[in-house]
Amino acid sequence: MAIINHKPTSPGRRGRVDVTRPELHKGKPFAALVEKKTRGSGRNNAGRITVRHKGGGHAQKYRLIDFCRNKDGIDAVVERLEYDPNRTSFIALLRYSDGERRYVIAARDMKAGDIVRNGEDAPIKDGNCLPMRNIPVGSTIYCVELKPGKGAQLARSAGASAQMVAREGKYVTVRLKSGERRLVLADCRAVLGEVSNHEHSLRSYGKAGAKRWLGIRPTVRGVVMNPVDHPHGGGEGRTASGRHPVSPWGLPTKGYKTRNNKRTDSLIVQRRKKRG
């Protein structure tokens, strides 16, 4: 992959930075693993906005991704790498030796023709999926399960990875990119390596319309709203709110802890690093 800085032929092109992806498949996705995707535009079943800044965007089809990687003991060939509009990482189409095809999250250096394998007997190689009790301590991993058989939940986005730093009894300790250290059952699976498209963070969209293509609507500051719309709104001219920053519903919005899952607090060995 290479970074492209465009010539400033227009204001939108001036600031745009793209990443070349010559290794990706240029045709349509595998039809049997594609489903219709309807947009909710951030509305719930009553039609009220529950998630702001969503709506519009280019039509997308959902690719069915195998997050469980539970087809054990059978070699699979990487047929091709593909772009997926539903996630930042690339996806790989695997063809197992019995003829079945599945999409998986692609590893960083994965390419067409590679052989991958799932299960306890899989070799220690990037792209292979194993229970974490069979993975050497210190390995870089991604697509980490939190419950055996539930499917990957951690380290799934572009360039993401985690590190297995310890194994003791029925648990392993996983260090995440945020700095958090977490206990995970050793029977949970993970994939060796790191997620593809690690240069995703280097791209710049260049114009507001490029974000609209993705279904992302504008974010309006509360201080420029009317007082009926936001606690920071109102006033003649530019005025500070006179209070600590809050959300539209009056809750503190900077550094306010929202975690409410006490059941798994005991599994977090070290909290994530503070930002800023």
From Swiss-Prot:
Entry-linked Gene3D superfamilies: 2.30.30.30, Nucleic acid-binding proteins, Ribosomal protein L2, domain 3
GO terms, molecular function: rRNA binding; structural constituent of ribosome; transferase activity
Disordered: annotated span: 224-265
Pfam families xrefs: Ribosomal_L2, Ribosomal_L2_C
Keyword entries, A-Z: Ribonucleoprotein, Ribosomal protein, RNA-binding, rRNA-binding
Gene Ontology annotations for the cellular component aspect, listed alphabetically: large ribosomal subunit
GO biological process: cytoplasmic translation
SUPFAM superfamilies documented for this protein: Nucleic acid-binding proteins, Translation proteins SH3-like domain
Subunit structure, as described in the record: Part of the 50S ribosomal subunit. Forms a bridge to the 30S subunit in the 70S ribosome.
Role played: One of the primary rRNA binding proteins. Required for association of the 30S and 50S subunits to form the 70S ribosome, for tRNA binding and peptide bond formation. It has been suggested to have peptidyltransferase activity; this is somewhat controversial. Makes several contacts with the 16S rRNA in the 70S ribosome.
Family note: Belongs to the universal ribosomal protein uL2 family.
Protein name: Large ribosomal subunit protein uL2
